[in-house]
Amino acid sequence: MKISLVSISELIEGEIIGDENKVICGVAPFEEATSQDITYAGSTKYLKKIYDSNAGAIIVPRDFQTSDKDIIKADNPRVAFAQVVNFFHPKS
């Protein structure tokens, strides 16, 4: 399954900073994400490591300062990421 960042941002009511047409193919934990995955950084621990991440996109808190990564700002990154996980892996 594939989805664009703009579609993800609409799903989670987030704000994209970066390439809104980027296509995401999956979800992964922060330290395991590849260039085709989206992940989230909801704590200071992970926000400090954002520049080292290989993720294609990262969901961050709305007050996070802009980075050179493709990000989606959300009110609650953990909840937003859970919504994206449910999109990729719907419960039957």
Report each predicted region and the residues it spans.
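Terminal amphipathic alpha-helical/low-complexity segments used for targeting or macromolecular assembly
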Residues: 1-92
